[in-house]
Amino acid sequence: VQEDYETFLETRTFKFPSWLYGPVQGKLLKVEIEDCPNFGDKAFVEFDSARTAIIVVDMQVDFCGKNGYVDVMGYDLSLTAGPIKPIKNILDAVRDGTDIKVIHTREGHMPNLADLPYNKLLRSKIIGKGVGIGDKPEGGEGQLLVRGEKNWDIIDDLTPADGEYVIDKSAKGAFAHSDFGVTLKKLGITHLIMTGITTDVCVHTIM
């Protein structure tokens, strides 16, 4: 700890902890941290590309696409569609010859809603003024957040590429009732780069 502390004072860099994860397997990348509290105006963190995954959280039609839940319920679609282009730019860069893994998550429920908790269904109906998960709203593509429906799938602009992972989940958090944790362990992932929606719910619950 003392050695890493002294290194940080000199370089403003959180060094990759080889003592914890072992030797670097891919490229050692260094990124700037903005607005890092208690560490000054600027700091950097190192991570191993081979142990890193981009997580694209719930970029589904229901949340950010035309005729999805957010759209047909009259909410401001630009708020959830705004991240599409930046995420696409990130994916294009990652897919261009890097060994960083890409993992998409997709929230949804069985057609019979057997995996939908009572409180989640009730809350969705309250927020939707009577239209909740499993219902087909007027103007919508299909039942809201039901697996297999067109509006449940990931938007075309961010369609997973061959070899990328898609984790289906029934909860807000990706670790609950899914293969997310097992997949990270299998791939040897130690660092996550988070993208997607929504920051205060499905993204935050992974962190």
List each language-model region with its residue ranges.
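Conserved beta-strand edge residues that scaffold enzyme active sites
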Residues: 108-109, 173, 198
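Internal catalytic-core helix/loop-beta-alpha segment
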Residues: 140-192
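Active-site neighborhoods of divalent-metal-dependent phosphate/nucleic-acid chemistry enzymes
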Residues: 185, 198-199
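Short glycine/serine/threonine-rich phosphate/pyrophosphate-binding segments
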Residues: 199-206
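Active-site acidic carboxylates
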Residues: 1-160
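Short beta-strand immediately N-terminal to the catalytic nucleophile in serine-hydrolase-like folds
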Residues: 195
